[in-house]
């Protein structure tokens, strides 16, 4: 299957499916229906079947989906056997939380290093991860580091993103409120926690369950 032809909305749901299939496999379950998947991941059955259809016949009508087959398929599709090495930039409260968490439920993603300008943090380890001065950014980001997490103050986010264009980084997960302009070689995902919270509150008030 040509990955370019898969809708981005479908691609964003694949890790969600994979996480649930992993849990099913660990529990010893052998097969699962689209209805069970729907209930667990809160995506309607029709959408799940359509998502899966982009990859061919993953299941059988009346039987559902073989859990081990799905696990193997999604592991390969999501490159779960390849390690994604990550750098975190900005070791404030949120950044520190990321360093302690370090994707403990995702064995193929690992924060390898962090950067900050606070002399009390530079040269130390947080969660077992070394913290370097931001001045060392270009020197430290080698070809092994593909993704950067930005948890810096909004007023310096663009400057940091500009510098990342000259490193091995090809993806940025931006947790700042700033909307960044990046080079074509970099894909950026914005996660504004304040906006997400405001959206949730709006839905709670206007679309009560």
Swiss-Prot record:
InterPro entries named in the record: CoA-bd, NAD(P)-bd_dom_sf, Rex_DNA-bd_C_dom, Tscrpt_rep_Rex, WH-like_DNA-bd_sf, WH_DNA-bd_sf
DNA-binding region, residues: 16-55
Keywords: Cytoplasm, DNA-binding, NAD, Repressor, Transcription, Transcription regulation
Cited Pfam families: CoA_binding, Put_DNA-bind_N
GO biological process, one term: negative regulation of DNA-templated transcription
Assembly behavior: Homodimer.
Name of the molecule in the record: Redox-sensing transcriptional repressor Rex
Annotated organism of origin: Bacillus cytotoxicus (strain DSM 22905 / CIP 110041 / 391-98 / NVH 391-98)
Gene it is expressed from: rex
